[in-house]
Amino acid sequence: MKKKTYLFALMAMALTLGSCSDNENGIGGETSKYITVSTSIGNMTRVATDEKGGQTFEEGDEISVYAWTGDATVAPETRERVVNNAINKLTNGSWISNPQMLWKNNRDKHYFIGVYPISAISDLSAGEYTFDVNKQTESDLLVAVNKDGLSYNVDEQQTVPLIFTHVMAKLVVNLTYKNQWGTEGPTVDKVAVGNAAKKATVNYLTKVVTPSAVAEDKADFDMPALTANKQYASIIIPQDGVQKITITIGGKDFIYDNGTPFKFESGKITTVNLEVGRDVIKLGDVSISDWGSTGEPIKGEAYD
């Protein structure tokens, strides 16, 4: 999977996935063998951008698709799925499905779940999730749910709208420095998040993420640098148990204690702006925003 660029944009594109006719149920004809799916990713997107600013998935990207009939509000077990983890890969500008997606019949409404990156999920109501700070692309998670449903109609070319949204949270830490560090500023050893949940369960039908409450599933982790010494960012499981961020410079820890735990929310970015002095860190603000908008800052202060 190629590294993605996070953009403040809305991406929409159509993809065609193969299907087969069901003559037994009256769905005949070679012209009726395709399901057209339109996809969009709301607000802050996880896609590539071209020189003109257009947004697309990249060649070779893949999504998992699940489909079922019956109750739209109940995530289906494996044996009840009409489509079970059909991998759709962007190949030469077209989405190729493996295995082919098949209509069950032309009577029942079909409901759909899309997952990016691809994932084989046995329990769609409580899928296991593990965060890996060293695999940011794989740890991000976008989910699309179509609960309106679609029935096959031989006389129409239907599209199945799949609107993907981020279900994980994102943390960004921006660092600035007092002039006592000089014009170039210091070299940061690391920026660490304290006592964060690294495992969770995901309900793919409702997009609800439940972090693990087990102590063994929590740990400190170092944030990847977007710009060394200046900006650090990471995917993080939605949770409300993290209270401290530590900046290490020259072996010395500067600890920001929020006083109360942060609330990292699904589909939102928490941005922490810190000004670092030699003896004290001052908090400029903390903002919480949707991926694609700005939030109101929460004022505060922090010390080493």
Task: Describe each PLM feature range.
Residues 2-304:
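Sec-type signal peptide cleavage vicinity
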